[in-house]
Amino acid sequence: MIENTLEKNNVTIKRQTEVSEVFGGEEVAGVFLKNGEKLDCDMVFAMIGVVYPTEWLKQSGISLGRGIIANEFLETSISDVWTAGDIAEYNDTVLNETMQCGNWMNSRGQGEIAALGMVGKRTEYKMVTFQTSHGFGDLIGFVGDTRPALGRTVVYRVAPEKNSIVRIIISEEKIIGATLINRMAEMGTITKLIKDGVKVSGMLESIINPEFDLKTLFPTV
């Protein structure tokens, strides 16, 4: 769906190849692709994801994984040392798994929790992470853990006539994450379903129906 939007807006996607060489003098003039194609250009952007600099901590004794290991209070393995931000690989008690979140909203929230811990007000970091983006008129949102890992169920709510789709990730009968395109009205509901740990077993056929109201998944009092 995203590729279709890009191509409709005159963005050319080169599939199954990659850049082998950037050429030019003091300024970039273009690139060569591995398939032999030459592309003239004025600018090159390299997107490789996030790399967490932990090399300098390897001799410190602090527990490291992909980032700095922490518990739900953002305490590291060393007493009176806290972590926060992109580097924090913490115990998420909402999703019941280890998480690492690279956005400003989490960095700010984690900074507050770490600061509270430093002044003796030990507080659990409990937040369902989300972020949004947009481009060429499409609205895109991510909430919770959006990875379709082994053992998880992935279901889709597709409405082609509205150019919208929601991919929902389910683990242990609970929704743990979702990716939304042009269906942002459901983001708040999905966030609360994740936070409340609502079980959705037996409701998959209803969930994939784009007309089904997700609010009805909440238990009635």
Q: Model segments located where?
A:
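Rossmann-like dinucleotide-binding cores of NAD(P)H-dependent redox enzymes
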Residues: 1-23, 107, 127-133, 140
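Generic secondary-structure signature for well-ordered alpha-helical cores
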Residues: 3, 7, 11-12, 62, ...
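A general beta-strand register signal
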Residues: 14, 32-33, 134, 170
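Well-ordered beta-strand scaffold positions
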Residues: 18, 36-37, 138, 174
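Short, surface-exposed charged micro-motifs
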Residues: 21, 73, 167
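FAD-site-proximal beta/loop scaffold in flavoenzymes
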Residues: 26-32, 37-113
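Mid-to-C-terminal Rossmann-like scaffold of FAD/NAD(P)H-dependent oxidoreductases
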Residues: 87-186
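C-terminal auxiliary extensions adjacent to catalytic cores
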Residues: 161-220
